[in-house]
Regions:
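Intrinsic-disorder-associated, low-complexity terminal segments enriched in Asp/Asn/His/Tyr and depleted
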Residues: 2-7
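A generic alpha-helix propensity feature with a strong bias for hydrophobic helices
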Residues: 8-9, 97
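Basic, often amphipathic N-terminal segments
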Residues: 16-127, 142, 146-226, 242-257
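Short, conserved secondary-structure transition motifs
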Residues: 128-140, 237-244
Length: 257
């Protein structure tokens, strides 16, 4: 597997050392995910990482911006979960690796799939998504949905089956019949026709005035990087050592030309 030159060899070596934990029988084993994440030298990656307070490609903390009307401690708390996952949009949700396959198998297949899809552009804007704040795009944009669907279908062989407790946890949310079928058949509810692209910026924020303050702050913070369309030229492999660990971006796969 060729590692992109932007990525730290030290980080990759750290990851390889953790591979032995994949043999653990417990559910709390490492997970992988395929995300859209901006190129690590892009402005969007930089300001997105700053917003969350962590760079997922290096794992290093970053000072968060000041949001008018919101204390720094509160802002830190409402970005806690997104900070752990990194600045991204989910294409194939986190999964444990099927023991019949290796990391090299997963990377090779992901690289081949990437090469079959051409780069494209999307327009992002700050929106409320339920009680979350997120960067979202036109839901009618088909290229992103098609890419996500291909990844879900063609990489499913690498996904270990969900444990019953994982299914039960997902079902604590209100799922439609379609979402529940997706969960049982593919390991995640929000795929195919139920997919909605979003880059999560906050936890659920129940107080509307707080959501409005933070949404306004996000619009200001991201404004310069969202003036132009965002190019989707790669997809990324993320890795989580355990359920208590943060996700790390360990490789990007360039889309075909």
């Amino acid at each position: 597997v060729n590692i992109d030159s932007h990525y730290s060899l030290k980080l990759w070596e750290f990851y390889v050392k953790q591979m032995k934990t994949l043999l653990k029988p417990a559910s709390d084993t490492p997970r992988f995910a395929i995300y859209f994440a901006p190129e690590i030298d892009s402005k969007l990656h930089s300001i997105g990482s700053q917003w969350l307070g962590r760079d997922s490609s290096s794992g290093k903390p970053i000072k968060q911006p000041y949001i008018k009307g919101i204390s720094s401690s509160y802002f830190c708390s409402v970005t806690k979960t997104p900070r752990r996952y990194g600045f991204h949009a989910t294409l194939k949700a986190p999964f444990r690796l099927n023991k019949e396959f290796t990391l090299k198998d997963l990377c090779s297949k992901t690289q081949r799939l990437s090469a079959l899809n051409k780069p494209f552009s999307i327009d992002l804007k700050v929106q409320e998504f339920g009680n979350f704040i997120a960067l979202m795009m036109d839901p009618n944009e088909q290229k992103m949905q098609n890419l996500a669907s291909k990844l879900v279908e063609n990489l499913d062989q690498f996904r270990a089956p969900l444990h019953q407790e994982e299914i039960d946890k997902r079902r604590t949310s209100t799922l439609t019949n379609s979402e529940d079928r997706n969960l049982l058949n593919w390991g995640y509810p929000y795929i195919f026709n139920d997919f909605r692209f979003h880059i999560t910026l906050t936890e659920r924020i129940q107080v509307r005035s707080d959501r409005e303050f933070i949404a306004s702050g996000a619009s200001s913070h991201f404004s310069k990087s969202l003036d132009n369309a965002t190019t989707v030229s790669s997809i990324s492999l993320f890795f989580q050592e355990s359920s208590k660990a943060d996700f790390l971006q360990i490789q990007q796969f360039t889309l075909g030309k």
